[in-house]
């Protein structure tokens, strides 16, 4: 599916210079609750206006298409210190290449075997931590009750903070797999108490199992309405 999608897109769009497969399909356990996303990144000569696209294949499988500009890969030094793009380019599966792009960028990224060494690893972790702290500071002095916008920022802050710990032992964790994989990552760095801390920051101490079960039907209804609206 990834190859077919890539062939179709590059045939109709000469701006695409490369494409690669990344994400959970490259992991040992790509499925989550019987569902999976196929994550494809297209690299363009110039960044298009629409940088993200989701395509439903079946109720359980979707294409998650990201678009990046070639200029984002110019500096190997910056790429090694990027907590997201660095890992994304470190070991993906190349699907297409119009120009000589992929091998050069990947070789520069891997040069000297420095990528996974403590100095660069800590640099990436600190970037995530700084980003999370910055978002937290932005919402910590609200002069009005928190609404959906502030809750979204809070969740993003927590997302970056959790990944600041996760990236000590591997690549950052995507949103949909965050709680599923964080326990093993915290254990890998001997910080198992952070798992309970993360759940606590999500409000787990304020709800019980029965209450959550009561929300499921409302979630299903809202999801159905959102899906119908998007179609």
Write out the residue ranges for each language-model feature.
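Solvent-exposed, charged interface segments at domain starts and junctions
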Residues: 1, 83-103, 107-110, 114, ...
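Proline-rich intrinsically disordered, low-complexity coils
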Residues: 14, 30, 59, 92, ...
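Short secondary-structure transition/capping segments
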Residues: 63-70, 113-116, 195-197
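Aromatic-residue detector
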Residues: 13, 29-31, 40-46, 54, ...
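Internal, well-ordered alpha/beta segment that forms a basic, Gly-enriched binding/recognition surface
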Residues: 70-141, 145
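Metal-dependent nucleotidyltransferase catalytic core
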Residues: 1-17, 22-91
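Conserved nucleotidyltransferase catalytic core and NTase-mimicking acidic/glycine-rich helix/loop elements
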Residues: 120-231
């Amino acid at each position: 599916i990834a190859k077919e999608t890539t062939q179709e897109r590059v045939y109709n769009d000469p701006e695409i210079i490369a494409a690669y497969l990344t994400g959970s399909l490259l992991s040992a356990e790509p499925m989550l609750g019987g569902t999976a996303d196929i994550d494809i990144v297209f690299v363009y000569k110039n960044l298009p206006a629409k940088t993200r696209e989701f395509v439903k294949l079946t109720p359980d499988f979707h294409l998650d298409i990201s678009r990046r500009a070639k200029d984002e890969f110019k500096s190997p030094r910056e790429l090694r210190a990027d907590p997201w793009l660095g890992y994304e380019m470190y070991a993906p599966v190349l699907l297409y290449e119009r120009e000589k792009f992929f091998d050069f960028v990947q070789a520069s990224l891997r040069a000297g075997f420095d990528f996974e060494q403590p100095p660069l690893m800590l640099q990436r972790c600190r970037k995530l931590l700084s980003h999370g702290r910055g978002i937290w500071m932005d919402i910590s002095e609200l002069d009005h009750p928190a609404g959906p916008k502030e809750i979204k920022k809070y969740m993003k802050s927590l997302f970056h903070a959790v990944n600041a710990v996760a990236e000590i032992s591997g690549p950052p964790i995507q949103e949909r797999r965050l709680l599923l994989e964080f326990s093993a990552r915290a254990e890998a760095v001997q910080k198992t108490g952070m798992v309970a801390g993360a759940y606590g920051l999500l409000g787990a101490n304020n709800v019980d199992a029965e209450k959550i079960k009561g929300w499921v039907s409302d979630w299903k209804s809202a999801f159905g309405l959102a899906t119908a609206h998007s179609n």
